[in-house]
Structure formats: structure tokens, C-alpha cells
Amino acid sequence: PKPEPEKPAEETGKPRYVWIDAAANFCDYENDKDRIAADLKRIKDVGFTDIIVDVRPTSGDVLFKSSVASPLKKVDVWKGSSYVWVSRTGTYDYLQTFIDEARKVGLKVNASINTFVGGYLCPYGLGSDGMLFRESGRKSWASVINAKDGLVSVMDLTGSEDYGARFLNPANEQVRNYVLQIIKDLAAYDLDGIILDRCRYDDYGLQSDFSDVSKRKFEEYSGITCSSWPGDVMAPGTTALGSKAGETVKKWLEFRASVIHDFVAEASDAVHRINKDIRFGVYVGAWYSTYYTSGVNWASPKYDPKADGYSWASANYKNCGYADHCDFMFLGAYAGADSIWGSGEWTMQGFCKQGRSLLKGDVKFCGGPDIGNSTGWTNGGQASKIPDSIKACINEGDGFFVFDLCHIKMYDYWDAFKKGFDDYLKTVKK
């Protein structure tokens, strides 16, 4: 039988997405198709329209067929009182299974990848996983940090304060080609959307990336000759800018934003060449005022942060805004449970209001909360806050998303989401 035509938007309202983190949900879905099917039915029944399936966690290995990336074989999982390795026992195509089961219940499917990552250093003496740790010949792909004691590869940072994802250098052409191929492989699937997460510089922020590759590219970009690297740009160990950034620093920040801008443009074009119907988008933190430290300008190029008083922005920083290369955008409105309403950053409503202002109609966007890790959310018990969280975000943007499914399940927030979506749908004109 032919599938029923989709209801027009005025009957279904704006899209409502739930994020399904690969690592956090691994134990439930790595080898249980029935559980995937049952949970997707429940997701649909409470009123979500879309799922976002993470298929490349921070180790950089993948849960779909790729010509260049290795299949994900294990993740570190918190069990009882410590982290343990859990190995994948399922042999089915994880992403294809989500697509198949979602189609049966009428959910749209978006796949997300962690973009500029290539490995993960685990706490509790578990060791590490990922391409960068397995292939020593690719150490030059990893970020180089401008640390207090000198330049150092993130692969040489092994202290307890350095646990977590190992980032790749976004300016490295080999890295870009590798990640682009992963994205092209993903675009071969029957997806509604592809979303880039962590399409940015390292978690070390302003300390990244000071490799020889980045130095050479910066000199080419800026016309500045760096004779005393990295001090030409920043003193060793710099983690924050003073109130007045110098011209070279501003040019450096512009350069980093141009690196990410050009990659997003390239990735968007690559996806649309393979399948023009796949929507291309990104996840970013909605805290624009400080997101420059990640090398990202997610705004419209029509928005000028310099004219808006941001002291770190050069005259050309606005040209690195990449909103016009995206079909949709997810803004992490990750405010605390008691910071739902407001007009500024670090309120959910304020994040979304600012998003609309900065994106200038270039792209549809939606904001949403992190209901497991943000202030006030970490211990559950916040079901009463969910309907307002939905209302604050969905009315200011073009949809709503929530991170993460595992928290809905852990804290049994299903009924709260159903109430929030039902309340919203009552306001939609029939």
C-alpha cells in the first residue's frame, strides 16, 4: 500500500526532535531491535515528529557503513559505581535499523555525527579507544595545544584532567577529506537530515590549534608572518582574552571561524550533491557571546558582531557566519531548570530569542534543553518544568529538540513530554 500523505504543517505543528546519543543509549540498542522498535513507537506516541540518531560518538568510530571509518565495537559505560567497557554484540546495521523502524511509525530520521573527533581517553584507568589511539601515524591529525609549558599534542596529554574526546585539527586537509568522506558515506542512507555535532575546535578552546599546519594556513590567510610562534598570536597558556583583543588575535579568531565556515559549506554541498532532499544542519551551543572560543560563527553573515560591540570580533568576522549554508540548525539552549523564561543568554527563551535575531531568517532553527546535565536537571524530578521548556523554545523558534532520550527514560519524563506537546498542539491553528 502507498504510504499516507503527510499531514500539512498546520495540523502537525513545528517539528519536535529527540536526540539519541550513541554512547548513552548503547546498552539498550546495540543488539536489541525490538527495544529500538518499542522505544520509537513510544517516542511517536508522546508527540515527537523526528529522531536524531547519533552514529559517531567521540571515539570517532561509527554505527553505519563507512568506507573510511571503523565500526564502533565498544563504549565505556557507567555501571554500578564505575565505568566498564561494553562491547557490541549486535551485527545489524544500527542506523538502517533506526531508519526502518522509524518509517514504520511515521517518524523522520536525522543522523548526527561528532565531527572533528578521533578518539577518547577514558577515566578510571579504562584506557582509550578510537582511530587516533590505534593509528600512531595519524598523530599529526590531532590538535596541538598552546599550553603554559609549550606546544603539545593532545595525544600527549594523559593526566586525569585530560580525560575525554581527542579532537582533530579542522585546518588539516587530510582531516577534512577524511571527515568529508564519512559525511558522504552517511548521505548514502535514506535520511531526512544530517547534523554535524562538535564541528568546531577542541574543548581546550582558545588554546587550540597551534600546529605547524595552522601556523602556515594562518600566515596564508592573514598575510602576517609569525616569527615568534605562538606568541605572535597568544601567550602560552592563554585561556581567556582580556577586555581588548589586539588586531592579530582578532585576525586569528577570524581565521579559525573561516576554517569551520568553509568546512560547513563544503559538507553541505557534498551532502546535497549526493541527495538534494537531505536537509543539512549543525548543532551548536546557543551561547554566541563566548562560542568564538570554539572557532565557530553560527550566525548569519548579515549579522555583524563587531558592530554589536563584541571586542573579539574583527571587521570581517561576520563573513565567517555560516547559517546560510544550513537547512536547519539546533541551538543548545542548555539553561538550568529554573532558567526557562527570559530575554538573555542562559535562559531557554532568551537563547532562542537571540538565535532568531542572529540567524536573520537564513535558516530554520530550534532550541532545546539538556535535561540530564544542565543545572537543576542532574537528579531528575523535574517533570513539571518540561511543558514550560517546550513552550519557551518552540514558540521562539521553528521547532523544539531535547537532549537526551536516555534522560527521558531514566527519569520517566514521557508523560511530561506528552502534556507539553499536547498543550502546544492546542495552540496550532487547524
Q: Where are each of the predicted segments found?
A:
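Bacterial Sec-dependent N-terminal signal peptides
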Residues: 1-11
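Active-site-adjacent "subsite" loops/lids of carbohydrate-active enzymes
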Residues: 10-33, 111-189, 245-246
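Hydrophobic faces of well-ordered beta-strands that scaffold small-molecule active sites
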Residues: 16-20, 51-53, 109-111, 194-197, ...
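Short, acidic/polar
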Residues: 26-44, 173-185, 302-324, 348, ...
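Catalytic domains of carbohydrate-active enzymes, especially glycoside hydrolases
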Residues: 34-61, 189-193, 318-331, 393-400
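Aromatic-lined carbohydrate-binding/catalytic grooves of carbohydrate-active enzymes
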Residues: 48-90
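Polysaccharide-binding and catalytic clefts of secreted carbohydrate-active enzymes
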Residues: 144-325, 332-335
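Substrate-binding cleft of secreted/luminal carbohydrate-active enzymes
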Residues: 312-430
